[in-house]
Amino acid sequence: MLGVLLVLHGSKIPEWKDVGIKYAEYLSRYFNLVEFGFLEFNKPTLSEALSNLLAKGANKIVVVPLLFATGTHFKRDIPRLLGIDGDEKKIQYMGKEIEIIIADPLGFDEKIGEVLVKRVNETYNKNY
């Protein structure tokens, strides 16, 4: 069964968790098993979120980093926190082999660009 794991950076500001909750709720319309976890500062951690998916029966996990570009978090921290060694895409969980695939960062996307235009216009109209 497919599990989706959203990865957020995390912040000392508690409201960051609301973003994870909203994106998880949105993706739950399309996928049965969706969890989110943070790289730092907030809970659930990536490890906790992964454990939740596995406990619910996921045996294939697509990890979706809510990051704009590749960097240390993408290349080193996410795999390490998920227990992935090197180029391996599998972990062991309670005697079972679990496949984990990490999606590319968001990068450039015109739909995200449209959101940025909307934010600029909203902010401008609110303040001028």
UniProtKB/Swiss-Prot annotation:
Q: What is stated as this protein's family in its record?
A: Belongs to the CbiX family. CbiXS subfamily.
The residues the record assigns to binding substrate are: K43, F68, A69, T70, G71, T72, H73
Q: Which gene encodes it?
A: cbiX
Q: Which reaction does it catalyse?
A: Co-sirohydrochlorin + 2 H(+) = sirohydrochlorin + Co(2+)
Give the protein name, as stated in the record.
Sirohydrochlorin cobaltochelatase
For this protein, the record's Gene3D superfamilies field holds:
3.40.50.1400
Subunit comment for this entry? Homotetramer; dimer of dimers.
**GO biological process terms held by the UniProt record:** anaerobic cobalamin biosynthetic process
